């Protein structure tokens, strides 16, 4: 499967809640995104022109969503249910859409300009 899905590691849990952590080499602007239940985002792919979209690196920090994807070269496709907290890496040339099952919050580890320069719809 070309999509990489990994839980976000738990550092500590106590009566206040949980502390999770992740590491990244990326710097600069990131996107904090809120989507309402029932909405669909994405419906595009990236060619890998932008470093920030090769791969697309996203952290679902709240909620539940379905990620539908299709490899444009092999034609392999699937739908994965994502339950926060989880990290998803989507390589270039993978068409994808994200359907919010509940209200969701996610962080994209790229800037808005990186995304717009390397986003293509079919």
Residues covered by each model-derived region:
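A short, N-terminal "cap"/entry segment at the start of jelly-roll beta-barrel domains
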Residues: 1-32
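Glycine- and acidic-residue-biased ligand/ion/polar-headgroup-sensing regions
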Residues: 53-70
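Short, surface-exposed beta-strand-loop junctions and turns on beta-sheet-rich folds
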Residues: 49, 73-75, 105, 113-114
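Short acidic-glycine-tyrosine-enriched beta hairpin
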Residues: 72-92
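Short beta-strand His + acidic residue motifs that chelate non-heme Fe in jelly-roll/DSBH
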Residues: 19, 43, 67-68, 88-90, ...
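Double-stranded beta-helix
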Residues: 1-4, 13, 97-122
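Short histidine-centered beta-strand/loop micro-motifs
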Residues: 20-23, 42-52, 69, 78-80, ...
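Conserved short histidine dyad/triad with adjacent acidic residue
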Residues: 12, 32-54
């Amino acid at each position: 499967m070309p999509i990489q899905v990994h839980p976000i590691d738990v550092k500590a849990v106590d009566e206040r809640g949980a502390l999770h952590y992740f590491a990244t080499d990326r710097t600069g602007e990131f996107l904090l995104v809120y989507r309402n239940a029932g909405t669909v985002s994405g419906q595009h792919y990236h060619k890998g022109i932008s470093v920030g979209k090769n791969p697309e690196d996203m952290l679902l920090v709240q909620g539940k969503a379905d990620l539908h994807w299709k490899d444009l070269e092999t034609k392999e496709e699937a739908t994965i249910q994502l339950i926060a907290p989880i990290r998803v890496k989507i390589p270039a040339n993978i068409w994808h859409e994200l359907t919010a099952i509940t209200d969701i919050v996610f962080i994209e580890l790229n800037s808005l300009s990186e995304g717009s320069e390397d986003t293509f719809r079919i």
